[in-house]
C-alpha cells in the first residue's frame, strides 16, 4: 500500500514539472514546405479519375476509387500544413485572398470535391487552386 504525504507529493510534482516550456510551429520544425507535395497528389487524383473512366473492370475501378480517396486526403493534409504552419499573419495581410484559396482548395480535395467526385473538371479546379497558392508561396519565399 502506498501512503501519500502532502509534502512528498509536492516535492515529487515539483521535480517532475518541466523547467522550460518550448513551442514550435509544427511537430518537427524542419522548415521544409512546398506546395509541390499537394500538386503531385492532386495530379495523381486527376490521373486516377481519367484511368477510372478508361477502364471497365470493376475490380480496377474499386481500387482506383480507394486510392483516389487516399490521395485526396493527402492533398488536404499538405495544404493544411502550408495553411497552418508556413503562412503567418503578415502573409495573410499581404494576400487577403489566401484564406479563401485554402478553404476552396481543401473543399475541392474533400468530400464535396475529388474525394467523392469522379469528375475530371473537379480535379482540374483543384489543381488550379493549388497553382494559385503555389504562386503566392514562392512570392513569399522571395521576400
Model-derived segments and spans:
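A ubiquitous, low-specificity "background" feature that marks scattered single residues
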Residues: 75-77, 82, 110, 140
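Alpha-helical segments in soluble extracytoplasmic regions
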Residues: 61-79
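Short, solvent-exposed, charged loop/turn and helix-capping segments
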Residues: 78-95
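N-terminal intrinsically disordered, cationic/polar leader segments
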Residues: 2-61, 91, 96-132, 136, ...
Amino acid at each position: 500500500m502506498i501512503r501519500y504525504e502532502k509534502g512528498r507529493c509536492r516535492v515529487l510534482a515539483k521535480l517532475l514539472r518541466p523547467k522550460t516550456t518550448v513551442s514550435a510551429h509544427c511537430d518537427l520544425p524542419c522548415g521544409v514546405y512546398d506546395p509541390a507535395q499537394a500538386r503531385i497528389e492532386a495530379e495523381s487524383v486527376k490521373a486516377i479519375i481519367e484511368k477510372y473512366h478508361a477502364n471497365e473492370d470493376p475490380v480496377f475501378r474499386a481500387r482506383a476509387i480507394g486510392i483516389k480517396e487516399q490521395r485526396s486526403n493527402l492533398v488536404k493534409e499538405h495544404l493544411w500544413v502550408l495553411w497552418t504552419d508556413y503562412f503567418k499573419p503578415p502573409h495573410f495581410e499581404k494576400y487577403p485572398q489566401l484564406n479563401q484559396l485554402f478553404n476552396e482548395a481543401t473543399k475541392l480535395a474533400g468530400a464535396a470535391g475529388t474525394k467523392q467526385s469522379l469528375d475530371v473538371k473537379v480535379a482540374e479546379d483543384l489543381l488550379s487552386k493549388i497553382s494559385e497558392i503555389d504562386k503566392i508561396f514562392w512570392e513569399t519565399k522571395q521576400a
